[in-house]
């Protein structure tokens, strides 16, 4: 069997790593060892932050809802409790969007929640 030299394979592998490391600073973009480590770490950060993004957005929606219901005389937790009691099933993303873009509709929902708490 003929001897196989690994030049072509190694070059292709390195090229793949360098492509993934494009835009990195310093040695991280042009030294294979540093580039490989940087690309691995970038993948870890990407995986972690895809999970974290969901938490971050939920927190943002909650802050927006809280800011919108305070002038109406409620806190966020009281408002959510009122929604649950009134049977309104609207998620936080939609509530946040309504609070920003459709304040009249949001106010109507808030009044319904307030009425459910009073009853």
From Swiss-Prot:
Q: Name one GO cellular component term.
A: ribosome
Q: Does the keyword Transferase apply?
A: no
Gene Ontology molecular function:
rRNA binding; structural constituent of ribosome
Q: One Pfam annotation, family name?
A: Ribosomal_L20
Keywords recorded for this protein, A-Z? Ribonucleoprotein, Ribosomal protein, RNA-binding, rRNA-binding
Q: Which CDD domains match?
A: Ribosomal_L20
Query: What GO biological process terms are annotated to this protein in UniProt?
Result: ribosomal large subunit assembly; translation
Q: Which SUPFAM superfamilies match?
A: Ribosomal protein L20
| InterPro entries xrefs | Ribosomal_bL20, RIBOSOMAL_L20_CS, Ribosomal_protein_bL20_C
Per the database entry, which stretches of residues form a coiled coil? none
Biological role stated in the UniProt entry: Binds directly to 23S ribosomal RNA and is necessary for the in vitro assembly process of the 50S ribosomal subunit. It is not involved in the protein synthesizing functions of that subunit.
PANTHER family per the UniProt record, alphabetical? 39S RIBOSOMAL PROTEIN L20
UniProt family annotation: Belongs to the bacterial ribosomal protein bL20 family.
What is the protein name given in its UniProt record? Large ribosomal subunit protein bL20
């Amino acid at each position: 069997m003929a001897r196989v030299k690994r030049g072509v394979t190694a070059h292709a592998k390195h090229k793949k790593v360098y492509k993934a490391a494009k835009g990195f600073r310093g040695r991280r973009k042009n030294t294979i060892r540093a580039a490989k480590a940087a690309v691995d770490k970038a993948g870890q950060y990407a995986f972690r932050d895809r999970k974290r993004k969901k938490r971050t957005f939920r927190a943002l929606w909650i802050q927006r809802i809280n800011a919108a219901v305070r002038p109406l005389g409620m806190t966020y937790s009281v408002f959510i409790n009122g929604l649950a009691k009134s049977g309104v099933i609207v998620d936080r993303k939609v509530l946040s969007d309504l609070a920003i873009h459709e304040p009249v509709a949001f106010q109507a929902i808030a009044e319904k929640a307030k009425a459910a708490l009073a009853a």
